[in-house]
Regions:
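Bacterial Sec-dependent N-terminal signal peptides
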Residues: 1-22
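Extracellular-facing/secreted segment signature in eukaryotic proteins
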Residues: 19-142
């Protein structure tokens, strides 16, 4: 019985860990008073958890190391309860443009003191040319 129980827990752990991955919480920047963190969990959906200042806008881009045209971006606006046009993309060295279809669903947008925490979900592949395609396997995002 102990062997069967051990095998069950081993297989359950193996299968549950193989189904998704997480970046863990990553500190992104603390320049000019803009402290940000990001965490990306990938399973059947992508779950993005961002923290940043509540009184400034901040953004996170996927799949690029500079402001390259076509980079998928999420933008958090300062001092707003709603997050209009959260899903955006870059056209080059300019302000991000609102994506025609907002694929991210903001499930939580809270402010505690001076810190805004946003939790949003999205499909791994939206089929939109302006959206980054997340892999179901761990890969660098850039």
């Amino acid at each position: 019985m102990k062997k069967i129980t051990f095998l069950f827990y081993f297989l359950a752990t193996f299968y549950s860990s193989a189904q998704g991955y997480s970046t863990g919480t990553i500190s992104l920047n603390n320049a000019a008073g803009v402290a940000m963190t990001a965490k990306i969990d990938v399973n059947t959906l992508v779950t993005l958890t961002l923290t940043g200042p509540s009184n400034r806008w901040f953004a996170l881009g996927f799949g690029a190391s500079s402001m390259t045209a076509g980079t998928d971006v999420v933008v958090c606006h300062a001092n707003t309860v709603a997050l209009p046009s959260f899903d955006r993309y870059l056209t080059g060295f300019a302000a991000p443009v609102s994506d025609g279809t907002q694929h991210w669903t903001v499930t939580s947008n809270t402010v505690s003191g001076s810190v805004r925490t946003i939790i949003a979900t999205r499909a791994l592949n939206t089929g939109d040319a302006n959206d980054y395609t997340f892999s179901s396997n761990p890969n660098p995002i850039s």
